[in-house]
Amino acid sequence: MISRHVARLLTLLCLLLATPSLSMAAESITDSPRRPIRSTDRRLRALLEEGLRISPTLRALVARLHASDVVVYLQCDGPGGPDGRLTFVSSVAGFRYVVVRMGRFARMQQIAMMAHELQHAVEIADTPAIVDGPSLVREYQRIGYVNQRSSLPGVAFDTQAAVRTGEQVLKELMLENASY
């Protein structure tokens, strides 16, 4: 009888140790070892965390990137920088690396711009043929349009999906803000 009780207790203990705790399960995807989104900018990391708490759309984008081979580096430029721009960096060891550079905006607009650019990263994740800058341009000529309003040098592309995503995340943030 005692040995059966001890065996059950040991089994329960093993299950508890082998199963991630609720706090670990709730751990932010941006803190996971295979972080799909990285930044050295504390403000951008904090805004991403805030956006993930509030926006189901942003959470879906990050989850999709987490399941992909795309790694995104976020950077914030000073005044006069681009509103937002994704640049293909490299394909190495089974991963595709992109950099998103954004201007500095107010909190909600910054999160919405981040979502807009992360939608572009998802578009790359959904297209395995994008492996370098030229293949990125070819794909965006197919799925997007030239952004005539861009003040950046060179050709800047955009997609309706990215525009809609940024708008949707901004709506979600404004609804949450209005509930306070």
Regions found by a protein language model. Name each.
Residues 118-134:
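Catalytic Zn2+-binding segment of zinc metalloproteases
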Residues 2, 21-92:
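A metal-dependent hydrolase signature that marks the N-terminal structural subdomain at the beginning
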Residues 53-62, 67-88, 108, 135-180:
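Metalloprotease/metallohydrolase-associated module, dominated by Zn2+-dependent proteases
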Residues 10-21:
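Bacterial N-terminal signal peptides
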Residues 31, 35-43, 94-101, 141-150:
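Acidic/histidine-rich, surface-exposed loop or edge segments in extracytoplasmic proteins
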Residues 77-109, 121-124:
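Active-site scaffold of zinc-dependent metalloenzymes
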Residues 114:
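A conserved beta-strand element that flanks and buttresses the S-adenosyl-L-methionine
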Residues 1-10:
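Bacterial N-terminal signal peptides that target proteins for export
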